Amino acid sequence: ISNNYDLTQGQTLVIEKFSNIYTTRDITSENLTIEQIRDASLDEIKEISNMSYEILFNSNKEVWSNYWNDQNIVIEGNDYDQLAIRFAQYHLKVMTPSHDNRCGIAAKGLSGEGYKGHSFWDTEIFILPFYTYSKPEIARKLLEYRYLSIGGARKKAKDNGYEGAMYPWESAWLEDGEVTPVWGAVDIVTGKSTKIWSGFIEQHITSDITFAIWQYYMVTNDEDFMEKYGYEIMFDTAIFWASRLEWDEIKQRYHINEVIGPDEYKEHVDNDAFTNWLAYWTIETAINYYNKLKE
């Protein structure tokens, strides 16, 4: 498409471009053909092309105004701290798929393509508490994502000789299972690709998810969620850890050997404190709730 314009000195030409994005994975596109999705996209473009930039801008402005009025955090102090919390809240808002429980939060958010948009333990430990306390309905959807992808966790446990649910270190689409790359960048010393061990032995994410479920339940008392999703995840992750433990006959105790803890620079660790404690907590918590439910 080409156009020619003759402008006089000082005259301004304004070009407005309207675009939208539709994918076959959108909830509204689940039962549509490619042609139907294309037509829906074009229909929307035709509709908004009749609106001015000001109308669309004000519509966007209203959405953000409602957000800040609803969830604004005010820090009494220097402006930098207020800017920092605003910056964090902005990214939490734009990178959270709050409309769709089939998606998790990408580790890099929308700031880059690092980790290919995969979800890590960052969601449950660092991000979820914000929503648990401010927007529990969004926190629930993020936890539902873990339930909807439990099939991949069960498959990973089985493939590794364990029972229950062993959650992937990196998660993507619901049926994908473990998506952590096996090989990374070339080591400048050896000249060979570096093996990425986290997908194999960084296993604390299984407990991280259960802890997040428990925390959400403690704050919201959402029994409906627990009965539909929470208890099942809790019990399956406890079963995994019970099968993962290694008995030491000499010392008469269990070990969890060959793991990576939160410090990813330390690989092949035996009895990492963080991993061990949360594994113990997961089993203990599951037993307590099992006994309560029996009553």
Model regions and ranges:
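Acidic/histidine-rich catalytic neighborhood
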Residues: 240-295
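Acidic/polar, glycine-enriched structural segments that form the non-catalytic walls/loops
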Residues: 1-115
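Solvent-exposed loop and edge beta-strand segments that line ligand/cofactor-binding
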Residues: 77, 111-121, 193-206, 263-276
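Non-membrane alpha-helical structural segments and their capping/turn regions in soluble enzymes
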Residues: 82, 136, 140, 207, ...
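Contiguous, well-ordered alpha-helical segments that form the cores/surfaces of helical PPI scaffolds
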Residues: 86-93, 113-117, 121-132, 197-216, ...
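Helix-terminus loop motifs that line ligand-binding clefts
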Residues: 96-111, 137-211, 217, 224-228, ...
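Well-ordered alpha-helical scaffold segments within catalytic/enzyme domains
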Residues: 69-74, 91-94, 125-136, 209-223, ...
